[in-house]
Regions:
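Active-site loop/oxyanion-hole signature of alpha/beta-hydrolase fold enzymes
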Residues: 9-11, 49-96, 246
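Gly/Ala-rich beta-loop-alpha elbow adjacent to hydrolase catalytic centers
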Residues: 97, 101, 105
Length: 252
């Protein structure tokens, strides 16, 4: 396990790492998740062997610290991720990023383009104030006090089911709520616009069971390769890992 300070006050973002050839692959998890749980089985596949691999837990999640005075906006998470990559000596990384982690990865690539050579985005959040879907956590519908102090966190853990709750319960409730609020608020310009403007190689995976990706044609016109993953919902890495592995390996 390695760590890097991210807030100037001693709080650390942490990751586990496997040695290998550059460029490094960096796996970034979604809201209430953890990198190794969602990605270790992907990185372990023979098609992806031999590359330096980092499994990063964002602030407030997994093994990383969760300071109460941190903002947890997408930009804050991106800066913390940059601190981890700087400490690790990583540049021109390939980021494999899921959901909220995909939004963070887009912001990172915009703010620190030298750190990112390729984005493999798995149902990344692209737009602010998205419509509420079945299976969403609903965290942002609570005030911070309701969520942290008045039972909101427990209700959400019951709602999301045992698999998501298994990692969500490891996240700090206050950090989780602020992260959810930051995700709903998004960025200015939007994550979608930032993604369209990037020059790095970009792949976006959309689970077929999640429906059509909004404004897919505009993304493709901007050079983003959009892949619909058969038989998969939001968690492509569990529903159809073969497609994700092939895309990460660049063998499609």
């Amino acid at each position: 396990m390695r760590q890097a300070e991210f807030d100037g006050k001693g709080s650390c973002i942490r990751w586990t790492e496997a040695t290998g050839a550059e460029p490094a692959r960096v796996y970034v998890h979604g809201l209430g998740s953890a990198s190794t749980v969602y990605n270790a089985h992907i990185a372990a596949r023979s098609e992806l062997a031999g590359r330096r691999t980092l499994f990063v837990d964002l602030p407030g999640h997994g093994i990383s610290d969760r300071p109460a005075d941190f903002g947890y906006a997408l930009e804050d998470h991106a800066d913390a991720l940059a601190a981890a990559l700087d400490e690790a000596g990583v540049t021109a990384a390939e980021l494999v990023a899921h959901s909220m982690g995909g939004a963070v990865a887009i912001v990172l690539a915009h703010r620190r383009p030298e750190l990112v050579s390729r984005l493999v985005l798995v149902e990344a959040n692209l737009d602010p104030y998205p419509p509420v879907k079945a299976g969403s956590s609903g965290i942002a519908s609570y005030t911070e006090e309701e969520y942290v102090e008045n039972g909101g966190h427990a209700r959400v853990l019951d709602k999301v089911g045992p698999s998501w709750a298994a990692t969500m319960r490891l996240a700090d409730p206050r950090a989780l709520h602020r992260t959810a609020i930051g995700l709903v608020r998004g960025t200015v310009p939007t994550m979608r616009h930032l993604l369209e403007e990037l020059t790095a190689d970009r792949v976006y995976l959309q689970g077929a069971l999640s429906g059509e990706l909004v404004n897919r044609e505009e993304l493709e016109a901007a050079g983003v390769r959009v892949v619909t993953v058969p038989g998969a919902g939001h968690n492509v890495m569990f529903d159809n890992p073969d497609v994700l592995v092939a895309e990460v390996a660049g063998k499609v």
